[in-house]
């Protein structure tokens, strides 16, 4: 049974060397109970059979268009998809993932019923051993402040929902002045706070029909010093934004996480990365001074973060010493 037309959804699927998974991904969109969709396949300069497969899929399914471009990375591919989208809504789907039949219907009905500019669905993580685990946040609207408070306090894997772009339904107008930062890894981290800030209403939908396939090709599984530094930069940008909103507690919580990222960058990095690291450490220290409060010192993680602020080299040495001796 088809669903009523509540607005065209542009499903943007960047594709780079994914001939093994792309068809399953696209056909999961074709099978949606909500049929008012266009599929935008962005072939990002693939070197395998992906370009030909994209063309074959487009010839088979009229709702699918293909854009071939030079390799520019995930951000550039998504931006290309946005530029060609004609839908009222945008939905980002990674090419090695897939969605259940009611995913788009659930999200667009939630958007329509709650006048939401962003609807955030849950997801189901599929491990390499094919074990599935669902993550979802209960239905309901949230303010911008409450959104980030929840993100800060959620210590489970479901905190992923607060950061990533995939599995969310966005009003197209949110991207009138926002684009993914090209050349950056952790691209979602750089813009999600801007999107949440611009949205009139953000709604959580507890459906877990986005199937996130965890594999060793993922960015998180193949972190380089440069990609780690991109993650640090994104966290610092968001911490600074929180301070402009006078959310010092949220900024401090995020700086605690940033400290862990800083500690994850090894000493044996190149000169360019070392320069970036030094710059980010200085910025981290500046943000720490602006966000720390007396109450922070009554927290274990607050005390350890303060120790890192005062004695970063000593902290790193002691941490590595403890880890060498099997103490976490």
What do these predicted ranges mean?
Residues 1-31:
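N-proximal low-complexity "stem/linker" segments adjacent to membrane-targeting elements
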Residues 74, 95-202, 213, 217-223:
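Donor-binding/catalytic cores of nucleotide-activated saccharide
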Residues 69-85, 95, 106:
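Glycine-rich, basic loop-to-helix element that forms the pyrophosphate-binding segment
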Residues 23-27, 51-55, 87, 100-112, ...:
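Short alpha-helix within the catalytic core of nucleotide-sugar-dependent glycosyltransferases
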Residues 209-215, 221-252, 261-264, 270-288:
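Catalytic core of nucleotide-sugar-dependent glycosyltransferases
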Residues 28, 35, 43-53, 70:
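A conserved acidic beta->alpha catalytic loop
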Residues 90:
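Short aromatic/hydrophobic "clamp" motif used to bind/position activated sugar donors
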């Amino acid at each position: 049974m088809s669903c009523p037309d509540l607005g065209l959804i542009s499903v943007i699927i960047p594709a780079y060397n994914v001939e093994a998974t792309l068809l399953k991904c696209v056909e999961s969109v074709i099978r949606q109970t909500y049929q008012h969709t266009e599929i935008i396949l962005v072939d990002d300069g693939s070197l395998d059979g992906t370009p030909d497969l994209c063309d074959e899929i487009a010839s088979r399914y009229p709702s699918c268009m293909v854009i071939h471009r030079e390799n520019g990375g995930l951000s550039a591919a998504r931006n290309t998809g946005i530029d060609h989208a004609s839908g009222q809504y945008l939905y980002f789907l990674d090419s090695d993932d897939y969605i259940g039949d009611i995913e788009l219907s659930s999200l667009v009905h939630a958007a329509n019923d709650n006048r939401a500019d962003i609807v955030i669905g849950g997801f189901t993580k599929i491990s390499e051993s094919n074990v599935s685990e669902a993550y979802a946040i209960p239905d309901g609207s949230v303010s911008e402040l409450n959104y980030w408070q929840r993100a800060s306090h959620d210590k489970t894997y479901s905190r992923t929902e607060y950061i990533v772009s995939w599995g969310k339904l966005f009003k197209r107008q949110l991207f009138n002045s926002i684009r993914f930062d090209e050349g950056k890894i952790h691209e979602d981290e750089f813009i999600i706070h801007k999107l949440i800030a611009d949205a009139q209403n953000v709604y959580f939908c507890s459906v877990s029909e986005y199937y996130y396939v965890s594999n060793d090709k993922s960015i998180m599984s193949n972190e380089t010093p440069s990609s780690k530094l991109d993650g640090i930069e994104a966290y610092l940008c968001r911490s600074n934004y929180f301070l402009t909103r006078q959310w010092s507690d949220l900024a401090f919580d995020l700086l605690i996480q940033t400290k862990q990222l800083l500690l994850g960058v090894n000493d044996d990095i190149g000169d360019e990365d070392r320069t970036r690291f030094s710059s980010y450490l200085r910025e981290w220290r500046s943000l720490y001074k602006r966000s720390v409060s007396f109450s922070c010192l009554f927290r274990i993680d607050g005390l350890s973060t303060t120790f890192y602020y005062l004695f970063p080299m000593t902290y790193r040495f002691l941490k590595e010493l403890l880890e060498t001796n099997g103490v976490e």
